[in-house]
């Protein structure tokens, strides 16, 4: 009898061990994250954090994707095709038009990462030469669209006498349109301009930073449903992002190695982007009041909105500062 009891206990122990061996560790939280575009160097911390296991360390399994501009990304948020969107500060205007999401943290300040570019053989040499030109942008209401309208506003150019922004999406259609003279230039990622300068295809006329002193270039958008039901996942993502920024600051060579492959640019261009852009990433996601004021006023001044929107329509501060 005692021997039978011992056998039973032994079998029970084996069963418990089997359960422990087979049972998975606490499953990582899946999070769908969409970049507004695939080719911007400033969005590559997502890839760095994924490749270095930083988001995984925070209990996240990132499902990454990219859209063809801010408006397309906002459509993905509306359609519940993504949980998080990495997009533009001007994109916060979409929140007033029914997109069921809010900005939860600032990602990037003044637009040191953006530029106005023209075809390599264009007669345009200075900002003043942009008057009357057609410049491609990603989508209506995007950061790139905002920059074109901002230059018009500061220069006092109106209507067709100034810059005409043409929504065209990403780099491939823009390059084709400039080659066939359908467009004079493009407003986009500075490093893309540098890369195409090396190929003697485009020239950078100006960066975007001179046209604004205080600004919110990029933010993180999160669906309101995700904010309400999975706030800890949002916090984990933001912590993972900020840890990734710290890693990038401390590891230039590895960052250049990863990011040059992600956005398909030479390492020399990625290194230049690193040197010029790395310092402008937010370290805690806080919304700067001066930058918000400039952004909100511009929505009205440029005809994007009729009235200055309330803060709580566009963003929430419950996740910042990120700690």
What are these regions (language model features)?
Residues 89-92, 172-261:
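Pocket-lining segment of extracytoplasmic ligand-binding domains
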Residues 29-160, 165-170, 177, 184-191, ...:
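Short, glycine-/small- and polar/acidic-enriched structural segments
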Residues 52-53, 75, 79, 102, ...:
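Solvent-exposed, polar/charged alpha-helical surfaces in well-ordered, non-transmembrane soluble domains
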Residues 228-306:
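Secondary-structure end/capping motifs
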Residues 299-323:
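Conserved C-terminal helix/tail region of periplasmic/extracytoplasmic solute-binding proteins
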Residues 1-6:
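Short, Lys/Arg-enriched N-terminal segments with co-localized hydrophobic residues
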Residues 21-28:
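Sec/Tat signal peptide C-region and signal peptidase I cleavage site
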Residues 12-21:
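Bacterial N-terminal signal peptides
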């Amino acid at each position: 009898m005692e021997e039978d009891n011992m056998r039973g206990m032994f079998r029970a122990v084996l069963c418990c061990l089997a359960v422990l061996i087979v049972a998975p560790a606490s499953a990582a939280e899946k999070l769908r994250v969409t970049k507004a575009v695939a080719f911007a160097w400033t969005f590559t911390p997502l890839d760095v954090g994924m490749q270095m296991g930083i988001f995984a360390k925070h209990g996240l399994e990132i499902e990454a994707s990219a859209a063809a501009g801010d408006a397309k990304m906002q459509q993905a948020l509306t359609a519940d095709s993504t949980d998080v969107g990495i997009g533009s500060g001007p994109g916060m205007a979409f929140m007033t038009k029914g997109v069921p999401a809010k900005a939860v943290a600032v990602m990037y300040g003044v637009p040191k990462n953006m530029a106005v570019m023209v075809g390599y053989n264009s007669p345009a040499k200075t900002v003043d030469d942009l008057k009357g030109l057609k410049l491609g942008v990603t989508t209506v209401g995007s950061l790139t669209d905002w920059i074109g309208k901002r230059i018009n506003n500061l220069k006092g150019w109106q209507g067709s006498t100034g810059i005409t922004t043409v929504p065209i999406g990403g780099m491939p259609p823009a390059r084709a349109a400039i080659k066939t003279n359908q467009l004079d230039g493009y407003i986009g990622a500075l490093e893309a301009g540098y890369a195409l300068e090396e190929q003697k295809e485009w020239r950078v006329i100006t960066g975007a930073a001179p046209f604004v002193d205080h600004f919110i270039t990029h933010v993180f958008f999160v669906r309101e449903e995700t904010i309400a039901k999975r706030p800890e996942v949002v916090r984990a993502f933001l912590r993972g992002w900020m840890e990734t920024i710290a890693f990038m600051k401390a590891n230039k060579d590895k960052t250049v190695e990863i990011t040059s492959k992600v956005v398909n640019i030479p390492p020399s261009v990625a290194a230049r982007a690193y040197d010029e852009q790395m310092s402008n990433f937010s370290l805690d996601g806080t919304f700067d009041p001066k930058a918000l004021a400039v952004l909100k006023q511009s929505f009205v001044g440029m005809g994007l909105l009729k009235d200055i929107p309330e803060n709580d329509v566009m963003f929430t501060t419950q996740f910042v500062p990120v700690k």
